[in-house]
Amino acid sequence: MITERQRQILNLIVSLYAKDHTPIGSKSLLDSIQASSATIRNDMKALERLGLIQKEHTSSGRIPSVSGYKYFVENVIQLEEFSQNDLFKVMKAFDGDFYRLSDLFKTAAKSLSELTGLTSFVLNAPQRDQQLVSFEMVILDNHSVLSVITLGTGEVRTNQFILPKSMTEADLAVFSNLVKERLVGKKVIDIHYTLRTEIPQIVQRYFKVTSEVLQLFESIFDDLFKEHLTVAGRKNIFDYATDNLAELYKLFSDDERMLHEIREITNNDEMRAVKFDNDEKFMKNLTIISQKFVIPYRGFGTLTVVGPVEMDYQRTLSVLDLVAKVLTMKLSDYYRYLDGNHYEISK
């Protein structure tokens, strides 16, 4: 446990170091702390013994340690009002109408990346809890069919496929009816179970060649069980990382691994999560910050940034909060549009 003055000193050291990345001495704190230089030095020694600050080899000043940053984020930091300049940039980016959920998420990721200079990610509400609200099949020609899946979030998934040789147009109608009767209205997690238990038995009753029908089910619904991550600023790692660049770029390009990282640190009721101590050695000097945003009546999505341990946390958290608020506002407009008997425009 640290004293209130030590808390103020840690706050100042973190804030000042974030601005110019030079070690902080006791004299730099005199104007802001009501204490003598000797008292401040003693408090700095106490913080150093606790492992919250550390000495820089080339200077007599001190810099925050990883533990210090962690303590600062969890116990000291207070969100400041976002700047008018940041507000203007975010509102300008989100100006206009959005007819695709993916475009909203791309705009959010790009805004986060540009304002923080970090790599950013946007994740929708957990797929397993989403509901399949409608299913349609459109015959394009004698051989091609388009399936259209609509989820409760308004997200539309389309899949064009070649009609199996063993299936007739009448078989296709039976297939469509099976989906509507057995799968529409269920959550994705329940659909996954139904496809592996009930559907194989039902297919045997209605179709002569079951293998191609089951393969068609898998082809249409397989993508439904995969979460999609929106990424911006992958190349920003070259600005804030010096080691293991190839490994980092590979990680940021691997949606499955990043999804695991993000879900792992946000798997609780907290609206914000920060991870400093990463198991991956090549990420030991990086911090992952995630913040949930409200998806009206559908749950919570997640905004995430990855950057150096010595990032400006005050500004980064402020920008995350700003983008989350504006994104939720635009999502409200988007769902009002969808609820007016419109459909998401899908590419």
UniProtKB/Swiss-Prot annotation:
Domain of life: Bacteria
Keywords, comma-separated and alphabetical: Repressor, Stress response, Transcription, Transcription regulation
Any one Pfam family match given in the protein's UniProt record, by short name: HrcA_DNA-bdg
GO molecular function annotations of the record: DNA binding
GO biological process assignments: negative regulation of DNA-templated transcription
UniProt xrefs under NCBIfam families: hrcA
PANTHER family membership: HEAT-INDUCIBLE TRANSCRIPTION REPRESSOR HRCA (PTHR34824:SF1)
Membership in a protein family: Belongs to the HrcA family.
Reported function: Negative regulator of class I heat shock genes (grpE-dnaK-dnaJ and groELS operons). Prevents heat-shock induction of these operons.
Identification of the protein by name: Heat-inducible transcription repressor HrcA
Organism: Lactococcus lactis subsp. cremoris (strain SK11)
Phylogenetic lineage: Bacteria, Bacillati, Bacillota, Bacilli, Lactobacillales
